[in-house]
């Protein structure tokens, strides 16, 4: 889903090299089973992909999902219908107590949280966001159906922003930003000083280029500044890529004095990429260096690995052990294993997984 699926057809026939870095002695990433279990819900939001989180100032974090299963969980078979019910959803989750959760959907049919208009051939997939004052802003991509199957859609535009009233969590409006030369700016938003730094990607034919822009935290609609070889400029044409990689999963966060870039190995089907990588930089615009393989998937089923994507960092969920929470999405096992049996499936094949990565595994200075 999100950009990983949108660019998947372009990337499908291309191969890439793995780049492994030795793990510092005594440091290891582990599957956070407790946090993974928070997503094993049986009512409301039950399963989905996406997994961007927006830390709010009321002790909660807004989790944002794409195609999602809402209800219809059978406790006897522990299964859900094979087809999801909504195109997007929200989940309000406590930061200190993640078991406190509230599903957020809308009143349309289907009851997606974000919707605009009545034509169900169009829908939103949410990306990153942030809060300012009593409003959360979420960056959205708008899609249109153009056929059946996993990739039966096309992106219409990526410049929509939803405004959400806090603490009511009601959507109070949508706006559309000026075009950004085909760059999808919704991979990450990082606050630093008076600015929000926003990251976006654009296909280069063999992967994606990563870009960064910034705008005042207090005013999303002020003139954006774009980073290029000459520094920051309000001229969009001055924008230059800050990183390139054979993937569509990019996420950035800040830990202490380092900017952390999280990417994934290329995967659009079963038994493809299995690795999650980290890079570090002293500046929001890179260069991102010090590549580490911080996790290799362990989600095998009948000897096969799933289609996986969207490794996102959630620094607000600090466990006090200098470990970064990262979630990643899996989307069943494709042609390798038939997981839809008599119209139902195990929701765990479409639920996010959580890992904890030691800061010093990412960078020994952290």
What role is predicted for each listed range?
Residues 181-188, 195-198:
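Extended, non-transmembrane interaction/recognition domains
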Residues 12-15:
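C-terminal motif of bacterial Sec signal peptides marking the signal peptidase cleavage site
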Residues 1-4:
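Positively charged n-region of N-terminal signal peptides that target proteins for export
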Residues 49-52, 111-130, 185-189, 248-251, ...:
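Beta-propeller and closely related beta-sheet repeat lectin domains
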Residues 19-44, 56-122, 131-180, 200-245, ...:
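Beta-rich carbohydrate-recognition and catalytic domains
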Residues 52, 264, 305-329:
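C-terminal structured interaction module
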